[in-house]
Curated annotation (Swiss-Prot):
The keyword Transport does not apply. This is Circadian clock oscillator protein KaiC. Phosphorylated on serine and threonine residues by autocatalysis. Has a 4 step phosphorylation cycle; the autokinase acts first on Thr-433, then Ser-432. When Ser-432 is modified KaiC switches to an autophosphatase mode, acting first on phospho-Thr-433 then phospho-Ser-432. ATP 2 binds at residues 291-297, 332, 452, 458-460, 462, 464, 466. The lineage of its organism: Bacteria, Bacillati, Cyanobacteriota, Cyanophyceae, Oscillatoriophycideae.
Length: 521
């Protein structure tokens, strides 16, 4: 994602339209800022309470010291230095060690617990001088100030505090340091800052949000402004992991992954034939249909085939437990437990509501990075779509499919439709365009009996069987049979039997059209 870590300024600083930047090494942040934060300028980080402002400020300093050996200064107006150091330990950052090494200095400007009385006119002259002294003494190149909102809350004269904040920003710019200044806002979508600080710190503005969408909260980061340089527009989802902030720059993803002509087996011989010899390696397959149509069975056969060939595979299940998946698979002659014992299969089961979509995406990426599978399956996408917006869900699917293709992994996903019989939409969340192959499964009623139908609805770059075939499920798995040759309107859910005379008449018409075409030629 980033350039190789180096202490040389040549590799840590970037020039974009005359503005030099320093990489933050925060996952995804350097992508959406097109190279990091502008050097020698102050960036305002605004957000409501709990959005991760302080975390971003601390991570910015820690990474600068760790990766580039840039000394840093942290000015705190809210938390005590002890709390900041203790909280950083949760992410594996030993701030006390770098403080002892003289690479980080924490300047405590937090309120006096015994209270304080302001006599006469208020100014930050003494604090500004302390900050300048610390910058010069420790040769600090990076500064984080958290948070200027606390200064306004301590003193009544807001206009005077604005003036003093402006003086502080001007001094930081004069000293040539790259700084982050956090501020709090009241609403997720409203004024940038609570006290109009953005009027003075307007070169660069980053907005962090934690919005309740549907039934779940969703964190996003937006680069509102980077004066004099380019950046990506819009909101980008992020999550907070054990390593700190992790942004998913979905808009930065490029369609540059390689495409293989190699085929892999689905684990079902007849389905391979319907797909022209199997699925393309590195492709994304979607099986969609009502509950009970056999989607999980197809996924199980797909994973079994991969493990049979010595490939590693991961199943991310969001509807069934490990025990239930293993039991059901065993009833079809598939031994998931044996595959796990051999180290070829990994089953990961969790409720969709246990985390946000960004957290699920991060877990999927981490597990893939650690286990290095050739095949993955998600059962099912529709479970993850519950309680979230279409846009958030689509971004999640793009993130998963993009990462799978980048890692050259074949993905098999399932989607449960609401409609039990008949035609159903597979484009409600716009995921059909993201997948390479779509397999439609559905129930059909023929002569008073319920049957199952399977159809390869779409397959990019390959011939595939257009027929709608009947299939059944027994103890050995799925059995795909011939097409419903004597029926039409299967997909609509209202199959109609075609009589022999009608078939002959249709054949005669087709022959007549062909003969007429040949005569004209």
């Amino acid at each position: 994602m980033n350039e190789p870590i180096s202490n040389s300024s040549k590799k840590t600083e970037n020039t974009t339209q005359g503005v030099r930047k320093i990489r933050t090494m925060i996952e995804g942040f350097d992508e959406i800022t097109h190279g990091g934060l502008p050097i020698g300028r102050t960036t305002l980080v605004s957000g409501t309470s709990g959005t991760g402002k302080t975390l971003l400020a601390v991570q910015f300093l820690y990474h600068g010291i760790k990766y580039f050996d840039y000394p840093g200064l942290f000015v705190t107006f809210e938390e005590s230095p002890t709390d900041i150091i203790q909280n950083a330990y949760s992410f594996g950052w030993d701030l006390q060690e770098i403080v002892d090494e003289g690479k980080l200095f924490i300047l405590d400007a937090s309120p006096d617990p015994d209270g304080q009385e302001v006599v006469g006119s208020f100014d930050l002259s003494a604090l500004i001088e302390r900050i300048q002294y610390a910058i010069n003494k420790y040769k600090a190149q990076l500064v984080s100030i958290d948070s200027v909102t606390a200064v306004f809350q301590q003193y009544d004269a807001a206009s005077v505090v604005r003036r003093e904040i402006f003086r502080l920003v001007a001094r930081l710019k004069l000293l040539g340091v790259t700084s982050i200044m956090t501020t709090e806002r009241i609403e997720e979508y409203g004024p940038i800052a609570r006290y109009g600080v953005e009027e003075f710190v307007s070169d660069n503005v980053v907005v962090l949000r934690n919005v309740l969408e549907g039934e779940r909260r969703r964190r996003t980061a937006e680069i509102l402004k980077l004066r004099g340089t380019t950046h990506m527009k819009g909101e980008y989802p992020f999550t907070i992991t054990n390593d700190g902030i992790n942004i998913f720059p979905l808009g930065a993803m490029r369609l540059t992954q390689r495409s293989s002509n190699a085929r892999i087996s689905s684990g079902v011989k007849t389905l391979d034939e319907m797909c022209g010899g199997g699925f393309f390696k590195d492709s994304i397959i979607l099986a969609t249909g009502a509950t009970g149509t056999g989607k999980t069975l197809l996924v199980s056969k797909f994973l079994e085939e991969g493990c049979r060939q010595g490939e590693r595979a991961i199943l991310f299940a969001y509807e069934e437990s490990r025990a239930q998946l293993s039991r059901n698979a065993f009833s079809w002659g598939i031994d998931f437990e044996e595959m796990e014992r051999k180290g070829l299969l990994k089953l990961l089961c969790s409720y969709p509501e246990s985390a946000g979509l960004e957290d699920h995406l991060q877990i999927i990426k981490s597990e893939i990075s650690e286990f290095k599978p050739s095949r993955i399956a998600i059962d099912s996408l529709s479970a993850l779509a519950r309680g979230v917006t279409n846009n958030a869900f689509r971004q999640f699917v793009i993130g998963v499919t993009g990462y799978a293709k980048q890692e050259e992994i074949t993905g098999f996903f399932t989607n449960t439709t609401d409609q039990f019989m008949g035609a159903h939409s597979i484009t409600e969340s716009h995921i059909s365009t993201i997948t390479d192959t779509i397999i439609m499964l559905q129930y059909v009623e023929i002569r008073g009996e319920m049957s199952r139908a399977i159809n390869v609805f779409k397959m990019r770059g390959s011939w595939h069987d257009k027929g709608i075939r009947e299939y059944s499920i027994n103890e050995s798995g799925p059995t795909i049979q011939d097409s419903f040759r004597n029926y039409e309107r299967i997909i609509s859910g209202s199959p109609t039997r075609i009589t022999v005379d009608e078939k002959n008449e249709l054949s005669r018409i087709v022959r007549g059209v062909k003969d007429k075409t040949l005569d004209e030629e």
